Amino acid sequence: MNESDNNFRIEGTLGESDKSMQLVLASDYAVVREKYIEVIEHTKNMDIHARWIYGKHPTDVMIQSYIDRQEMYLYMDGQNIAAMEAITMYQGEDYHEIIWSQNLKDDEVASLHILTVAPGYQGKGVSKRMIADIISLVKKNGKKAIRLDALASNTPARRLYGKLGFEYRGKQNLFAENTGWTDFLYYELPLEGIRTTNS
């Protein structure tokens, strides 16, 4: 990855100095795109759980937009991409229909999108370390909660979010290009009282 003064970097919170989260640069678009395609093609039961289809979800436009807005992050293991996610420092209007534990303004919340772990790193605790660094970043930006959604069919992700402290808050039946009409489940991690090594 290219170096830049805009590169936000956090050392891994579990003491692994070679693990870090970094902001994706515009020049890294092709690398990120290919990594998402690799994840879709090589993740077991992708068609059953996350049901991602590249070009429908995620899309080139989606990834480029996150990068352009400086919302796309990589979790690196040395020079290797271990995981990827988009972090928006606000929530979208579709989140307004859910009864959350706190009545927060859109810009008091961070939302996670297209979070994924590279095939060679799945099942190795990368998600836990990455979420710890996301919490540090989000708290540094003054947010009070992290919110996200997952397909009802994505049982591995839902189990993971529960283990990481996210609370189930409700569901909506929505249309997506890759799934058609389906249930989306919404999760929240209130940040009050959560301490990290960077806070």
Task: Mark where each language-model region is.
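A short beta-loop-alpha structural element at the N-terminal edge
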Residues: K19-K35
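Hydrophobic adenine-recognition pocket in adenosine-nucleotide-binding enzymes
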Residues: L115-V117, A150
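Conserved acetyl-CoA-binding loop-helix of GNAT-fold acetyltransferases
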Residues: V117, G123-S136, R159-K163
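Conserved GNAT-fold acetyl-CoA-binding loop/helix
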Residues: E41-M62
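Conserved beta-hairpin
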Residues: Q70-I87
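Conserved GNAT acetyl-CoA-binding A-motif
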Residues: I131, V138-A150
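C-terminal "cap" of GNAT-fold acetyltransferases
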Residues: L151-N154, G162-L164, L174-S199
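Conserved acyl-donor/pantetheine-binding loop and adjacent beta-alpha core of acyl/acetyltransferases
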Residues: E85-I114, Q122, F175-N178
